[in-house]
């Protein structure tokens, strides 16, 4: 949604289907590259790497900032000062950039919210609705939240400003982004090897960026990243290690299993954490076995996220190594 001015003509972008509200991260990236004059944002979701990148671009588009003059950050403990900050002029500057972080004001009633917090939300919502043109004339206002529910304030910003939910990226999206980074440094890596990296290092974008940069530096310009490079250089998440351990246990490879366990202990993973992770893993294998018997959807039974769908094949394969009674009694 694009705001096209700061006077009475300010209005949301209209599409053939009506008012465009919640936008995708790709659309937000495109609009930020074009430096469109957005003024009120709600950015939230679990993909914090992309969220923080978008926040940096908004700040860059805004221009020079001086903390306390034309740049202010508010949090949950002082969000009630927001209206005052909006109305306080940015002396010597045309506009003020206000970032409100982790305010927890985008939650519906209940959930332990005090009456005072409810009143603050109502006050901010009414102020933005009634004074929107004044707000966009004087401020760029950005709300950054981990989670956001559709309360009154959410709906107001969705109608008048820009709301973007940074959902966890799917495997093909992660693959495309990592491939793009590699190409930018003139380093080759196959799609299969990128998927292998994701399986080993997890789906957190920041972690994957760190790992791919490490691999790019090792391969060098014109080089190629291979599976053995990933094994040698990248940090495996404990879940990936547990998959390796379970594979070897299922194949009765006791020596290899003990070696993996020794490596976990050598890396100073607490024994209690290892045992709990193993227990949860075998519990998932048992759930997989039951789901297969009852012809149920494995991903739904395991409550997998969209970027974890690749795990269904691995759980099915590993569940086949064990009898149902063995998994139930683990």
Residue ranges and their predicted role:
Residues 6-7:
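Intrinsic, low-complexity polybasic segments
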Residues 12-20:
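Short, Lys/Arg-enriched N-terminal segments with co-localized hydrophobic residues
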Residues 20-29, 33-34, 38-41, 46-244:
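Non-catalytic interfacial helical region
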Residues 21-26, 33-46, 81, 88, ...:
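Helix-rich C-terminal "collar"/helical-bundle subdomain used as an assembly and partner-interaction module
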Residues 179, 198, 215-216, 246, ...:
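Amphipathic alpha-helical segments within well-ordered protein domains
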Residues 220, 250, 265:
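Hydrophobic/aromatic-lined pockets within catalytic cores
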Residues 237, 245, 249-256:
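Short helix-adjacent coil turns
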